[in-house]
Swiss-Prot record:
Single annotated GO MF: RNA binding
Record localization: Plastid, Chloroplast
GO biological process: mRNA processing; tRNA processing
Protein family membership: Belongs to the intron maturase 2 family. MatK subfamily.
Xref: InterPro entries: Maturase_MatK (IPR002866), Maturase_MatK_N (IPR024942)
Pfam families the record matches: MatK_N (PF01824)
One of the record's GO cellular component terms: chloroplast
Primary localisation category: plastid
Naturally occurring in which organism (per UniProt): Micranthes punctata
Keyword RNA-binding: yes
Record's keyword terms, sorted: Chloroplast, mRNA processing, Plastid, RNA-binding, tRNA processing
Protein's recorded name: Maturase K
Superkingdom of origin: Eukaryota
Keyword Iron-sulfur: no
Amino acid sequence: MEESQGYLELNKFLQNDFLYPLLFQEYIYAVAHDHILNRCILSDNLSYDNKSSSLIVKRLITRMSQPNHLIISDNDSNQNQFLXHNKNFDYQNQMISEGFAVVVEIQFSLRLVFSLERKEIVKSHNLRSIHSIFPFLEDNFLHLNYVSDILIXHSLHLEILVQTLRYWVKDASSLHLLRFFLYEYQNRNSLITPTPKKSISIVSKRNQRLFLILYNSYVCEYESIFIFICNQSSHLRSISSGTLFERIYFYGKIKHLVEVFYTDFPTVLWLFKVPFMHYVRYQGKSILASKGAPLLLNKWKYYLVNFWQCNFYLWSQSGRIHINQLSKNSLNFLGYLSSVRLNPSAVRSQMLE
């Protein structure tokens, strides 16, 4: 447990970063405007006036600077709206989402530069990344027996989504603005597809840059907790009585570990070094494979369902996670059908006289 405490230490250098003032700088929205313009050119969709876009941005920044536009009361829901109903409504929505995405990317870039300066990435040269998909399929796939096909759930509660992002963005003002932005878009049925109980589906053809950041932050949070627990439990395989009691004690502490991760875990555990169980992800789909019997994957299947429900308030059914034997079924992954072919060997015996 002492080694695992190192993952729970907060990264102090990012706690004093204030990103909220950047949201009122014109050059941020100039970058966002160029991104939108390039995307519109590629899609041959120029539905707004380019000449008036800079004026719209300046007016938008001015309105964002006024606190009255960030207050919406129940009695006056149609007045003082932050996002007004006009012909430029869609463009303003895109500008705000793209601007926020640019600001959050700055935070990610600072974290990456800091890691490179401290040479923290060198520590992982002897471990297998969970995103090393092709080495996994080439080297490890042939030695596996059972595989669990998992579709990552993507319908999140708004507050859970904001709380997940706060591990990366320490500026409370920016997160409050994001919360207001998501709730306003949900009420107007513009940016997101609303689901019951104030949840959103992180799937949108528009504003892809912002939703890509939100989706990745959620997946990183999910993987950092789930893989860490898988990694810790896999070291308890001995059949001795001492290790058996250690295993029982560990599973009794799983709930505590999840709570600690959910409140204090600042970074993502990118590496998975378990030799008997393998995890790999591609976009919204992941697989969990094992060399042993299907009982182990069955256990983790039900745990994964409870994990999503308890930590992210995601309703998921165990029937959506399929466990297949590779010798009898093919795995549809990365557009390929992969399977393991058995090589039966003939055994010949001879009676001795």
